[in-house]
Amino acid sequence: MRRYVRRGAALLGAGAAAVALVIGAGPGGAEPAAATGSLKMVALGDSSAAGPLVGTQSSLDCLRSTSNWPAVAARALGAQLIDVTCSGATTADLTGRRFGYIAPQLDAVTADTDIVTVAIGANDINMGGTVLGCTQPLPEPLGVSCKSWMTALGDTTDAQLAAVRPKIVDAVNRIHTRAPGAAVHLVGYLRYWDETGCYPTDPIWTVDAQWLQSIFDRTNAMLRRAAEESGATYIDIATPSTGHGVCAPYASKWVEGFIPTSAAAPYHPNQSGMDAAGALVASAIGR
């Protein structure tokens, strides 16, 4: 039995408290969080976890925030955090050196690790470039839908994601080898759009917003399947974030649009989103 399981009762209380709180209210290497509990948590992943431009940045190379959701979750769980999330990271950066000098993210996982969170996959299919490529200076029917020209030869999203899944499964298997007692959690992406876009407040047409959200949905489905295949746990943060996306009112927005209304990179979680995601992750880990 994993050592992590024996601490489940304490984690459950911490996770529940974190959710109640949120709903009610240097170099690119590893960054320890303030929490120094007996649990050791390692966070791997891309900008969805790193938090570019949110609060204080601990790494300019990786645009990593000290108040991102891994930090929020670690504090709620009373865990010591080693955060190696990095904006722009792909699955290749789990085992290879990003920019040629940032250590492979998996190097942060050691035999005494209790919890590992992994939030990655979207950059493998160039999701950031796809979203930005869908911004439109002109309203419908002027201009051209990005979906129409990006899928002119067919929508290759599913094939691309099918190629990413075994890479994530392999990464989780490597984590199990490096830290046999660790619980591994694959964390999905927040929901960006609901049924419609909100042009011109955000310059993406509804037809394209719906298509982009379908890609996020399919990415999350891929992560869920990868978790099932590798003995990890999938954490869904998309469903609870419905109504908090790009088009939400300022006070309830968790994800910023093309022109951020609070500190965050375009089309990335803001601090409210990081706080909410951190609480959701802590609650899921504590179950």
Q: Where on the chain are the PLM-derived regions?
A:
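Catalytic His-Asp segment of secreted/periplasmic serine-dependent ester chemistry enzymes
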Residues: 190-287
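C-terminal region of N-terminal signal peptides and the immediate post-cleavage residues
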Residues: 12, 19-40
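N-terminal export and membrane-targeting signals
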Residues: 1-16, 31-34, 160-164
